[in-house]
Structures are given as structure tokens and as C-alpha cells.
């Protein structure tokens, strides 16, 4: 891919700033200015089963929510049926399990799809979920031309942060382009892709990296669509106009507002210069937002309400760069699964912003602001340069390893700033004194998932398989494989497969046979090493070296593993980087490992400690399984301590310790350097106690 011309954004007039965000003539509000319509109000939700989630959606819609945002469980996201060994402990945990068309019918029962705007956070299996959605809409009699919504479908960012990829980049891009070209012809009001900056920020991206990498990902997709030749030249602008974005908003209010204005300006320029889009409405940067969930604090979590409010303002105050849809996390997401009441609190926050304040009654209040103009231009200029760096490497696909290592390095820098106190987090590293919170009730403050839900979903799956026409399902799967081997668009055959009773895992396995699977780079090996000069880190290095000497080892060896399907690798990567900096020899093989693979690696690598990271809620089943398999491989957790990190309620942590876990860490344990010293101490204590 050719790079764009480098340098400053010369198209920005020096007298009135960036175009189109700050070009403005007239008063802030005319006498007859109508109040703007609010953004789509959504709550990201789904758990346990399709029927339970359907009931939740209907309650939220009755409370004033204006669109759906569907969270799928990890087996659905990664293409496994509920009875697959890799799905154990993960079914219905972080979202709703959708194993077949019957589940999709139950999920959408009583919700008229021709009147609903539905966002589906789904990527590797996005085509399959869209196929089932369209099949249900057809059954409802809803015209495909009237379906509105979004499939996230940004697989490139999955390689960089979220981790729910399946196939290699080439076939994954093919699935995306098939969805885009199908959408242009069949579901023209549907956004076939949400290019995501959200997860990049959580993975460590600076505002400049967030803008640059996201736009580079969008270029990779649009260039691939253009290369298919399936979209007539005169229709390509409308295809560009259906590309939407999913962004993040952090607490640096002015910087975040300026970042969104930079996004708006650069997308306008990019679509005009690279793709020749003349109609301004097709160059519009259309984006939805969820504010920063992983930035919420576990200590004094009630303060998160203020964080969420400020982050929401950053993407709603500026009319020229206002979000089209907004979903806000619950205040206690850093601690466990929020209750419906917690989600309602965030929903009411949106409604207060939209209906009680006057922010929708004015033109853009930042027009003419020299401060915002300057910050916007700074981000835009630097992002344009960084985007060219990526394009010069062959584009986003060719630069995956570069972008991943840059994100890991940026997150490590951010983590060190928090630990040193350079970056203040109220209630975490400063102002930690607190009164007891009336909201802090371990037994009552989280949603309780039904422990039998996984068994019921497996029974549901078995019943579905037993009642379908097996020959029709097999024939439909053959058609999927044939289309994958050729150049036929895969969406129509996927819709037919859904109607024939094919399951999520069967559809994904058919494509695995043709496309193969992929392991993304971890970025850990390329992250910059923290040099001498930090007293706490130097002290821990000395402790680690001392323990190694006393137990007769050249170096302490740590295995960092992520069992199950949880792809949120940021924490594991930072633990691996800090362990390396503290003097450990680190074995880190990436995400989505089976308990057996972790246990086998612990034995083969002759490690001194095993660290497990789980954020999906599957710890209760997966961790004991790892312990049992370690013992089967001759690795005694009493001699090789196992430590676990994640969003783990104290009651669960106590059970894990009873099962043989040496220590449990949660987001409250933010100081990784101190943690490394504690882990070294656990290794020495285990060595002493076992001789």
C-alpha cells in the first residue's frame, strides 16, 4: 500500500482551524435552534442463556434504552459449541451463548427487527451471527432493506488486543469483505464493520497510536473491498459511508475531545483523498462509544461513577464530533458481573445527560477554541505520520507485530507511571484513606450466574442436533466449505446453513478446515526493558536473584498462562514484561490455552512458579483443572506455587486457595513490582517447606 504524503495537514486553513470540526460562522445557538436528537442509548448486555438475555433486553428497552448491544459468550465468539472441551467453564459467563438458529430466535423473541437498531460485539464469527440474525428477520417478515445495526467484525484489532480471532489475516479479511459486499446489496442500512479504537486504548495506545492504528485498519479493509471488484465504482462511496467506528474515551477530558475531533477530520481527509469520496455525508466519521471499562478502579469503586460521567462528556459535548451511540459500563465492573440495578444506574446517567442538561441545545461549543484546535491539530498531525509508518510496512496486516509491540510498550509505560505515582489514580495510589462504603456488600453487589446454565446449554445443543435434518445440515456444511475454497460470497451459504440447523461450532470448524487457525504475536519479547534507576525494581531484582541462588537455580522461571477462551491479554502481557524486568526467565505462550497445555508446559519447562490470568469468570472450573493436571504431570503445586490474577470475588478467591492456589491477585493489586517480590517469596517458601 502506498503511504500518504507526510507532513502537516496543509488542508487546514490557518485562520479558522481544522476542517470540518472547527469551521463555523454564526452564533453558538440561533433563536430557533431545535434541540438535537440524543445519541442511541445502549447497555452492553447478555449472559446465561438466550431466554434470560431476551428478558433482560425487554426490561432495558422498557426503561428507555433505544438500541440493543449484544454481548456474546466466549465460545460463541471463538467458534466453539458449548460441549467442546475448550468451552468448559466459559459458557454464558461474559455474554449470551448462541449455538444455533433456535438460540437466536429465543434471543430476539418479541423484538421487531425492522424497528430495532442492534449492535453485536462479534468478530471472528461475525458472519455467522449476522447470518442467523438475517434468518430470524426473514422469519419475522422484516424486509432486509430495513434492518439496522452493526456487527463489530474488526478482526485486525483482535490480533492486537482482544484476542477472539480464529483464522489467519488473509481469510479473515476475506470474511469481512464478503460481509461488506453482501451488506451493500442486501442490508444497506446495516453497518457491516465497526473499526475499533476502543480495545487499542485499553491495550495501551496513546491517542496518537489509537487514531493512527485504527485508520490504518480501516484502510486495510477498504482497500481489500476495492480489490474484490464486486462493488461498482459508482457505489463505492456508499460502501465507504457504511464503515463505522467503535471508540473509547478516557479521563483526560480535553485530550479525548480533541482526539475525537482529530478522528473526524482525518477520516474526512482520508476518504476524500484516497477513495475519491465527494459526498460529505459518506465521509462522515460515524462512531459509537463505550467509555473505558478497564480503567475503572477496584479500590473505592464508587468513584467510578464520576469517571464514567466525565468520559461520557468527552464524546457528547462536541457536536461536530459527537458519538452516534453510547454505552456506559457499570460502576463495579472491575469487581464482578454487574447486577441489572448497576446497569440501570449507568443507563440513567445517559438519560440525565441527554434529557436534563442543555448540551443538545447548542452548536459545537469548542468551535473557535485555540486550545482545542491546537490539541486536535497536534494529535492529527502525529497520527497521520504514524499511519504512514504502518502503511509503509505493507499496511495494517503487514504491521501487526509492530503495532502489537508498540501497544505493549505503551501500556508498560502507563503502568509504571501509576506505580511510581507520576500518574494519579484517586483511591488507588493517592487519597487511599476511606470510610466504609454502604455499597460494599460482597454477597449482594454482583449478579449471580446460574451454575447449571452450562449444563442446560449443552442439553439444548444436543436436543437441537437430535431434532434437525442431519443430511440437510451436512449438505449445508459442504456448501460452506466449497464457497470458502472458491470465491463465492460466504454470507448466503451461511444463512442457508443456519436454516439447515448447523451449529456455531460446526460452521467455524468447516472454515477451520479450509482456512486453518492463527496465533497472534504477544508483543512481550519486543517490549522495552526497564533499565536500572528505579529503586523498588532494583530491590526486587536483587530479591529474585537471591532466591534463585538460595534454591540452587541459575534464574527463577515463571510460566504465565491464560487458560480457557479469555482473550484479554493486557494483564498477562504486563505481568510477563514486569517479571522479565524483575529478573525472572518468563515462558509466555499467549492466549487461549487448555489446562492440559499449561500443565504440560509447566512440566516440560521446569518452572518454579505458574501465573494464571483469567478475566472471563471461568476461574472456578479452569484453575482447579490446571492444578489437577499439573499433579498428573508430576508438578506438585505445593512445590511449584500457582498464583492467579483476575476479576475474582473474595469468596471465590478463598475457594481457590483451599484448592491449592498460593495467592490470588485482583485489580486492587496494581503494583506489579511489589507483586513480583511477593511471588519470589512464595517460590522460596515453597522450596523450604517441601525440602
Regions found by a protein language model. Give the residues of each.
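Acidic/polar, glycine-rich intrinsically disordered N-terminal extensions of enzymes
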Residues: 1-103, 107-114, 137-142, 385-391, ...
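Catalytic alpha/beta active-site cores
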Residues: 1-256, 274-277, 281-290, 322-329, ...
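Conserved, mostly hydrophobic/aromatic
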Residues: 64, 100, 141, 267, ...
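Short beta-alpha connecting loops at secondary-structure transitions
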Residues: 88-93, 118, 157-167, 200-204, ...
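Phosphate/diphosphate-binding loops
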Residues: 99, 122-125, 163-183, 264, ...
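Active-site-adjacent beta->alpha loops and helix N-cap segments on the catalytic face
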Residues: 126, 130, 594-596, 618-627, ...
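Flexible, glycine/charged-enriched surface loops at secondary-structure junctions
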Residues: 144-147, 190-192, 228-240, 271-285, ...
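Flexible glycine/proline-rich, aromatic-decorated loop/lid segments
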Residues: 236-239, 277-291, 299-332, 338-359, ...
